[in-house]
Amino acid sequence: MQRSPLEKASVLSKLFFSWTRPILRKGYRQRLELSDIYQIPSADSADNLSEKLEREWDRELASKKNPKLINALRRCFFWRFMFYGILLYLGEVTKAVQPLLLGRIIASYDPDNKVERSIAIYLGIGLCLLFIVRMLLLHPAIFGLHHIGMQMRIAMFSLIYKKILKLSSRVLDKISIGQLVSLLSNNLNKFDEGLALAHFVWIAPLQVMLLMGLLWELLQASAFCGLGFLIVLALFQSGLGRMMMKYRDQRAGKINERLVITSEMIENIQSVKAYCWEEAMEKMIENLRQTELKLTRKAAYVRYFNSSAFFFSGFFVVFLSVLPYALIKGIILRKIFTTISFCIVLRMAVTRQFPWAVQTWYDSLGAINKIQDFLQKQEYKTLEYNLTTTEVVMENVTAFWEEGFGELFEKAKQNSDNRKISNGDNSLFFSNLALLGTPVLKDISFKIERGQLLAVAGSTGAGKTSLLMMIMGELEPSEGKIKHSGRISFCSQFSWIMPGTIKENIIFGVSYDEYRYRSVIKACQLEEDIAKFAEKDNIVLGEGGITLSGGQRARISLARAVYKDADLYLLDSPFGYLDVLTEKEIFESCVCKLMANKTRILVTSKMEHLKKADKILILHEGSSYFYGTFSELQNLRPDFSSKLMGYDSFDQFSAERRNSILTETLRRFSLEGDAAVSWNETKKQSFKQTGEIGEKRKNSILNSINSLRKFSVVQKTPLQMSGIEEDPDEPSERRLSLVPDSEQGEAILPRSNVINTGPTFQGRRRQSVLNLMTHSVNQGQNIHRINAASTRKMSIAPPANLTEMDIYSRRLSQESSLEISEEINEEDLKECFFDDAENIPAVTTWNTYLRYITVHKSLIFVLIWCLVIFLAEVAVSLVLLWLLGNAPAYNKGNSTISANSSYAVIITSTSAYYVFYIYVGVADTLLALGFFRGLPLVHTLITVSKILHHKMLHSVLQAPMSTLNALKAGGILNRFSKDIAILDDLLPLTIFDFIQLLLIVIGAVAVVSVLQPYIFLATVPVIVTFIILRAYFLHTSQQLKQLESEGRSPIFTHLVTSLKGLWTLRAFGRQPYFETLFHKALNLHTANWFLYLSTLRWFQMRIEMVFVIFFIVVTFISILTTGEGEGQVGIILTLAMNIMGTLQWAVNSSIDVDSLMRSVSRVFKFIDMPTEEGKSTRSIKPSKDCHLSKVMVFENPHVKKDDIWPSGGQMTVKDLTARYLDGGNAILENISFSISPGQRVGLLGRTGSGKSTLLSAFLRLLNTEGEIQIDGVSWDSITLQQWRKAFGVIPQKVFIFSGTFRKNLDPYEQWSDQEIWKVADEVGLRSVIEQFPGKLDFVLVDGGYVLSHGHKQLMCLARSVLSKAKILLLDEPSAHLDPITYQIIRRTLKQAFADCTVILCEHRIEAMLECQRFLVIEENNVRQYDSIQKLLSEKSLFRQAISPSDRMKLFPRRNSSKHKSRPPITALKEETEEEVQDTRL
């Protein structure tokens, strides 16, 4: 960043904002980079501002029982705030004085008052000076208030972030991500722009009193008629506002429904394509869009009338003020023109400034109170440590996640009177839930000496992670004592990777030790992985480590924990994502050798780990089931296997037992007490929750097996559009903005630079922060991501674009002592953005405008209609000129008033009186037409938005995966949310305002030019100057806005990253470091925002300077030109003053239109995406059967020409090569093999070898070369949908969209209920579905969060059965499954797919033994393809993975079936008394 010219700028340069000229010049000539942005002043740095506010807040906390945040803010910012308020008031006073001088100038043209005529020139000078004074007061005041608002936002941003790092885990579990994002965006954004309006709460009333005093002098009591009309108008607009809010509230829910489905579609686009659901998803989304647009039109019409009422009220205000006075006394032109000028100022004060100011105060005080409540939440308390102790002791410890744990689950109760769901009845789903007082850990005791290894085991949800949390101090014990030294290192169960390099993630701010670092890298098996990267360990990782496999992330997290020199190491299931070979090696080299002298607590379920542990603690339902050595365990607890693995023999489970497990799953429900829904209303059966940080928690989601524990949570994040999940009392009139999203689906909120409007999209169910922290990367069904490319393949991510990472990137110095630097260099700055650097011009091209106008044919005719109505209004204005020109002739002979003023009377009892009313009648008719003229325009522009949304949705669904892989899920979602909302809401009315303002200016210039042609000569250069200024400013401002929007991403990325790794941060004591990084991100955003505010003020001031010069010229031309009557002078000066404000408004509106049209450009960019190669141009709706006609079928013994295809499932792969991107590196090369019909083939290979990629290539989801034939039919000879229909797919990432069970199983509605129930029976889903009200019509939301992962896998299995596919692709179907569901899947595969070809990618040896042949993939190629017997007899990866005991036990069983052409699946393995070993490959 460059040093700011502001530091050395003179007073005049600061006053006129001339110091911004270098950046404006540079932005006009070339594209701006972050290196071009100026450094922020030290007074604006987050460090200084946060320290200042934190000091005052601490003072407030210490001195009062009821501390008020507003008092702390007042002590920090009050005097500057008031100073700029006084400047603003003085500037506004000049507006009230200007009409007085205008009236005196008009009066000076009285033919009988020659003295007054001689001072007209001085009055003109005075009037021009008032404009100059106003300009010099108003712009510094507005900028100063914007600046203070920015500083307040920064200070509170920092204060909130620091508080977040201190919050207790109990509090975090009650706060949703949406609430935090809302707190840091919607609420704080109110200060940026709102502060400039806040002073009008007292300025506007004073101004009204001053203006009414002046109008009383002119019109006496009749002046209050105009004021009364304005008050009625303000109340009318308030009513329209409430009506608009009602429509927006209704519409927000519809928008949310559409965006939920859209985001699920985007995030799971690969599954959509694999299932051939493109048409079904398109139809589903379009139906929701239709409902949404009905409400959108209603809201737009109300907003249109609200806006039009202001524009057309000016005539009636003047008319109602003047008419009573004229009827009684008659009126002269001077009073009319003076009244017009007064009423313009009065109208703005009453209908705009005062209501806006009141709303600003209401919103700001509400935001301050929310922040104040948040800042007083309970904080995390560290335990008291004994630094001298060398042992870890826990004595009789009991703990609750909150007092009286056992969440008060909301049970369903159907009220027979009002059909509402209410809380309190525990009879519908649950029985015997005596949950109050249920502890998460009960009476736990153990003691381990220094250097010992304690293995903690237990079933899912037994309390293992809670035990580690209690040692770390995250969970406070209610009874008992804990003793240890306090020097802790921690490795989370779910890998946490911060954006940055591998080295940064491992060192994590600890001083660098080369030998220790290399030892840790080696022990954690990271050497080979690091060697593959060109930058080695300095490669920049994306948010959440998206560029890495799950195993690599797990090893880096482990390496971070091991690198820190601590007394106690807490390792929470660190081997969950590792293949069995890597796991064995790391356990031996790292845990057993490298850490041999350290105290270790390892959470594990592996038998070999228990054998090598010094002590074993087995937990069961929160209690200590066993504590001792392994030999004692075998002797004392021979039944420990079932407690360890979490299940007994599957065959011992009755249907009732399995249903009771489902009942545990149903505890995931929470019902909103006031939701007026009926169980029978299918669209309203989604269980909603409020986002309240309130008295009752409504988001408790517990695991589905045997437990009420806290940390077995697999919960899905709801869509929080605009990143917002507001409190129930939050106004729904919100800025429309999207938050970057994280890997877990949180949002990032872009903020408009002026005043944003738009709906809030509320999530249906809130995601607590605690659940985010305990959320598995692989288990999470993400809705949209913040800073990472979407992984749209089954498991392996394509190489990410490393130019889009966060500010953490490359922060290690290259010196030998590698402390993490706290400086941000320009390389870092380039990598901090969310959105791709858009290839969109700084200024919207004319081609975009032309294409937008021609989207809908009638739009051109609507524009012509508006122009015709405008020309009619101009004609009426010319009639007025004629009346004014002839008024003296009428009045000379018939006036009843004094001769001194008879020359100027236009309303008398003579014929002129009637002529005037004829004019009024014509004017009213045209005003009525003008009032409605924009309605067709708004209606048509919304229709254009509808068409563009449809085209973009179709384009995205038909785009190839190589194109979609190059984009981010969050970026695509922004097009459907933020950009479509702009097309729906902002663009139509902004275009209407601009056209209307432009026509008003043209009309006023035309009238003035007719009266005084010389003025037209002065008008031309002014308009040309405005156009040049606009073009000059627009190039820079749009780039600065883009940089500011992008610079906001690191703030929210850092917030979500910190939340996900909060336990790790605390364990490592890195809160200060992360606070520093957060301040750096804030400063980066501030630099862009401050520069944008400064350049905007430069532009506004230059526009006003040009106008002041124009007004001076007009004034002196009018005054110095002889022979002018007071009527013409009054019209010229009044219109000139009106032109000033209107032309400025029009120029600003044109800039807004250009800015909003960038959304149209982005939408067109998506519409123009390529479609999948070979995609049929006609619509292909999947049918039950696929008959091949006119398709070349290769000779194949397994298929007949007339058969339904595919009939056998024989598959031949020839020279298959696959790439993620066009021209990219080959991920698979020259793969060739053949599969017989009905054969089962297992895919083997280490993590990242390409197994899942091969399955994607079969479905043509990648760029592929070579050929695949199924039953003799080549993939080149049929459409993509026909090809993909041949496959049934159970992906690693399960896709459950928001909709009914029926829709999820059969989105095309091809099958009857009987057929669906039959399949549900086959896969074991019937008992699950029947538990829900509505059964097949029950609405699943949030990725089916009420279902366990196993139930979701069964849904995928049911889809495959319904598809009648002959080839089944399974990508790690047993990952994260409970044992029961796993056995159901195995049984279903045996029964429902007995005659199908199965290709299985799996880590569990037990599952792989069902296969007849194995395909071993290494280094992108097929290394081996043979039977299990052959692989076991040779040196192979399979032989390395399987133990000798398993080989001896399992080989004969497999060998006995080798003579059969297609052996049946081995009978389900009964649970024995032998050791249970979860062996995975």
UniProtKB/Swiss-Prot annotation:
Subcellular location: Apical cell membrane; Early endosome membrane; Cell membrane; Recycling endosome membrane
Motif window: PDZ-binding: 1479-1481
UniProt-annotated binding residues for ATP 1: W401, G458, S459, T460, G461, A462, G463, K464, T465, Q493
Transmembrane segments: 78-98, 123-146, 196-216, 223-243, 299-319, 340-358, 859-879, 919-939, 991-1011, 1014-1034, 1096-1116, 1131-1151
Modification sites for Phosphothreonine: T717
Membrane topology: Multi-pass membrane protein
GO CC terms of this entry: apical plasma membrane; cell surface; chloride channel complex; cytosol; early endosome; early endosome membrane; endoplasmic reticulum membrane; membrane
Residues reported to bind ATP 2: Y1220, G1245, R1246, T1247, G1248, S1249, G1250, K1251, S1252
Residue intervals annotated with topology Extracellular: 99-122, 217-222, 320-339, 880-918, 1012-1013, 1117-1130
Entry's EC annotation: 5.6.1.6
Similarity remark: Belongs to the ABC transporter superfamily. ABCC family. CFTR transporter (TC 3.A.1.202) subfamily.
Subunit-structure text: Monomer; does not require oligomerization for channel activity. May form oligomers in the membrane. Interacts with SLC26A3, SLC26A6 and NHERF1. Interacts with SHANK2. Interacts with MYO6. Interacts (via C-terminus) with GOPC (via PDZ domain); this promotes CFTR internalization and thereby decreases channel activity. Interacts with SLC4A7 through NHERF1. Found in a complex with MYO5B and RAB11A. Interacts with ANO1. Interacts with SLC26A8. Interacts with AHCYL1; the interaction increases CFTR activity. Interacts with CSE1L.
The protein's name in its UniProt record: Cystic fibrosis transmembrane conductance regulator
Gene source species: Microcebus murinus
